[in-house]
Amino acid sequence: MQGARLLLTAAFICAASTPVLAVEGPSAAGPIGGTDIRSAVLPPPGLYGGVILLGAEAFDFVDGNGETIPALRTAHLAKQIAGPFLYAVPDAKVLGGSIGLGFIVPIGNQCAHLFIGEPRNCTSGVGDPYAEIDWSHSFGKLRPSKFPGAYPILQGLTILVGFGMVFPGVTYDASTPLQQALSISNNIWDFAPTGGFTYTTPPILADGTEISVRFFWNNYIENRDTHYQTGDLLDLEFAVSERIGRFQVGVTGFYAFQVEDDELFGVPIPPDGRRTTNAQLGPIVNFDMPAHNSSVKIKALTTVLTENTVKAWAVVFGWIKKF
């Protein structure tokens, strides 16, 4: 059967403040670094667990025109996150499809300095927990791989709909802009309907070319500590890859943008509502280990487009195993 997708938590989307406002950065539903390969395919029934590791740096805080914010021209932020997770697929069908339930709690360390002359500081703690429920149905068919020892290939179309929820975490401090930027948690609720598809072609190059797309609509509740209201964020995530036996190699990325202004005490943030746009792109490699009921994955992402947020790079490693 298909290897399980690596699941869950916030993509690295960190919004920079104007110098006079607290730093607010929206959590975003979905996996660390974004969904990618097999994103609409659920694993076979069973209980799965694993960990996702993230290392990332934000090195250029930009305004709505994509220009560096002068007061933040020396700002730098680095984070290391570990996200242990569980994902359960009951042995039952609902409307002809499978149901999946996932939960993750990110734990990490974040170091930063924001303003010129400000010292570097670090914070460790627990981030925003994330839960997701999915329904997936395949219109395709399983066929054997051309390579011995590999999972069968699910050729054809698979669709998914679901709902994700980000919970306010416990490590949060809004006392200063720096402490807020360093907080592992964002202290806001996020309710996110999601949907997408995975399509795998017949074996043309190797075992088949796969196209996966996921969409998240992030709806935020006001941060009660700062009275900052983050505008809705739409997030389109994708991967184009080739199945080659136990390997899967390709390109992945995401494009996220806000469709509403950010507000403070109900007033839009000048001059442009601080509407964020962020796109990242990079390579991905997955390796299945059927003998151990597990898979590992690594990808690297770098910013290709940004407004009212940061230019950044990230490396994401994931491991999953069926218990």
Give the label of every model feature segment:
Residues V23-G25, R38-G46, A58, P90-I99, ...:
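Short loop/turn motifs that connect adjacent beta-strands in outer-membrane beta-barrel proteins
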Residues E24-A28, G55-Q80, I116-C122, A181:
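Surface-exposed strand-loop-strand hairpins of Gram-negative outer-membrane beta-barrel proteins
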Residues S27, T68-I69, N223-F323:
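Outer membrane beta-barrel transmembrane domains
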Residues I37-S39, V51, G83-V89, A131-H137, ...:
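Residues on the lipid-exposed face of transmembrane beta-strands in outer-membrane beta-barrel proteins
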Residues G49-E57, L101-N109, I159-F167, I211-W217, ...:
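Transmembrane beta-barrel strands of outer-membrane/channel proteins
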Residues T74-G140:
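Long, hydrophobic/aromatic-enriched structural stretches that serve as scaffold segments
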Residues A75-G83, G97, T123-A131, L157, ...:
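Residues that define the transmembrane beta-barrel architecture of outer-membrane proteins
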Residues G162-M165, Q179-V267:
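Detector for outer-membrane/organellar transmembrane beta-barrel domains
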